[in-house]
């Protein structure tokens, strides 16, 4: 029986390979490579050859991964090129990094900023003071220690020793004091924003857009865009009810001396919080449906009784409502407005209303024409009777429900016709046929409405009992 350790030692001696220590890992790998039988374990020649080939290939791969001296020199030259200043193209002296990530010599960057306050590489405007590049400083020390040809001028000057001096002639110190060192929170979506550029913050201590450094002191709280929203909540949490504003806003005033650029007037409140807006006691310009301004001069606010009556067109020929035994059709008024006016006159006369008095005074002035109008109406009725009698002699007269009137005009004595009021003739004829006495209302029917020229008409009734 061949032992595993001795078998492995023999294999290594034949191949002139280095000796390996006997450990558990090697024994496990050898067990996997050497097949075993049920009774005894023997080393197989095929398994031994496979094991030797795997060892040789792994050693050759490890030798290829080790870089040569030429490759190391090329890599070192690239690192030295990276550590050069983009302005003077020399090794960095007191390296300082801007908020956009570019590194320059302090003296080179200072001279550049005096001419243009922007990054020399990307031309981004610089809001904050560049910071010392400590990591670049350590890398330069490592490179200088490994290569004697690397310049060491100014490297030994630690930039941390220059922190107390006024850097960059104080051109960034005054500008930084105008902004609060706390975080601004957008009240609409709750997004953290930078106090200088209002850019959305991913890092709560640094703005990636403008490089603004945000203080992490305990006294520095979060500022809200709208200072009137959280005044009550902040006051209750801090136990300060004596001050009348948002505590965070007051802190911003104390830090800067004036309101931040994101502060808004006190009356700029949100529309969904239900606050009482400034000027809410004034009359609203947005009225609901059916509402109107009572002070509007274009709207007539008088009562109905104070309005003038509406004039209606007068149809002189009235429709046929019936006939007498002689075959003469009685003239009757069907104008409901005139009947309502007469009923209204009765009520006003009985109640002693003031409107009746004013109308009577107006009608009194036109009372002199009433006699002439009544005589004219009588003449027209007589002419109508004559025409009807003559027509009845020529053709048989029959009365039925289908009787109708056929008006026609006559130019005879047209110049003697006088003007009359609205509905006067139809009301006069209707009252006479009904036996109604119009003498007490003589002044009423002669109202002072605009009169129009009337034309004389005649009524002829053509009826037949049987159709031939």
Curated annotation (Swiss-Prot):
An example GO biological process term is: proteasome-mediated ubiquitin-dependent protein catabolic process
Main location (coarse class): nucleus
- Positions annotated as zinc finger (RING-type): 85-123
List, as start-end ranges, the regions of compositional bias called Polar residues: 417-434
Provide the Gene Ontology terms for cellular component: mitotic spindle pole body; nucleus; site of double-strand break
Where is this chain compositionally biased, Low complexity type? 386-402
Per its UniProt record, what Pfam families does this chain match? zf-C3HC4_2 (PF13923)
MF-aspect GO terms: ubiquitin protein ligase activity; zinc ion binding
Q: Which parts of the sequence are annotated with region: Disordered?
A: 1-22, 386-468
Quote the InterPro entries the UniProt record gives: Znf_RING, Znf_RING/FYVE/PHD, Znf_RING_CS
| SMART domains linked | RING (SM00184)
Localisation = Nucleus
Task: Tell me the keywords, alphabetical order.
Answer: Metal-binding, Nucleus, Zinc, Zinc-finger
Q: What is this protein called?
A: Uncharacterized RING finger protein C548.05c
Lineage, highest ranks first: Eukaryota, Fungi, Dikarya, Ascomycota, Taphrinomycotina
């Amino acid at each position: 029986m061949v032992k595993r350790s001795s078998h492995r030692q023999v294999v290594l001696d034949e191949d002139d390979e280095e000796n390996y220590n006997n450990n558990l890992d090697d024994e496990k790998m050898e067990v996997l490579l050497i097949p075993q039988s049920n009774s005894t374990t023997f080393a197989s020649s095929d398994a031994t050859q496979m094991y030797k080939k795997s060892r040789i290939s792994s050693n050759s791969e490890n030798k290829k991964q080790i870089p040569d001296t030429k490759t190391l020199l090329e890599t070192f030259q690239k690192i030295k090129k990276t550590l050069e200043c983009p302005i003077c193209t020399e090794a960095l002296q007191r390296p300082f990094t801007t908020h956009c990530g570019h590194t320059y010599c302090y003296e080179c960057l200072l001279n550049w900023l005096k001419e243009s306050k922007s990054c020399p590489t990307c031309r981004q405007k610089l809001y904050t003071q560049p910071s010392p590049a400590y990591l670049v400083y350590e890398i330069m020390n490592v490179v200088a220690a490994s290569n004697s040809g690397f310049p060491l001028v100014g490297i030994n000057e630690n930039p941390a020793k220059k922190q107390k001096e006024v850097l960059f002639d104080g051109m960034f110190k005054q500008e930084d004091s105008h902004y609060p060192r706390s975080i601004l929170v957008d009240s609409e979506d709750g997004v953290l924003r930078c106090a200088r550029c209002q850019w959305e913050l991913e890092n709560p201590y640094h703005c990636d857009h403008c490089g603004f450094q945000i203080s992490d002191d305990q006294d520095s709280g979060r500022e809200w865009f709208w200072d009137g929203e959280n005044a009550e909540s902040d006051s209750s949490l801090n136990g300060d009810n004596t001050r009348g504003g948002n505590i965070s806003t007051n802190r911003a005033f104390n830090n800067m001396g004036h309101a931040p650029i994101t502060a808004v007037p006190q009356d700029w409140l949100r529309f969904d919080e239900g606050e009482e807006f400034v000027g809410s006691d004034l009359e609203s310009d947005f009225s609901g449906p059916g509402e109107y301004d009572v002070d509007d001069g274009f709207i007539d606010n008088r009562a109905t009784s104070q309005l003038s009556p509406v004039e209606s067109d007068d149809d002189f020929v009235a429709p046929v409502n019936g006939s007498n035994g002689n075959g003469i059709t009685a003239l009757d008024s069907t104008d409901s407005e005139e009947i309502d006016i007469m009923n209204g006159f009765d009520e006003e006369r009985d109640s002693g209303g003031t409107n009746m008095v004013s109308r009577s005074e107006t009608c009194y002035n036109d009372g002199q024409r009433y006699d002439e109008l009544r005589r004219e109406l009588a003449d027209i009725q007589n002419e109508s009777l004559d025409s009807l009698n003559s027509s009845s002699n020529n053709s048989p007269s029959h009365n039925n429900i289908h009787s109708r009137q056929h008006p026609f005009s006559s130019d005879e004595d047209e110049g003697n016709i006088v003007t009359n009021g609205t509905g006067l003739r139809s009301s006069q004829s209707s009252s006479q046929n009904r036996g109604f006495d119009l003498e007490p209302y003589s002044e009423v029917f002669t109202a002072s409405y605009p009169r129009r020229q009337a034309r004389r008409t005649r009524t002829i009734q053509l009826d037949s009992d049987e159709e031939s």
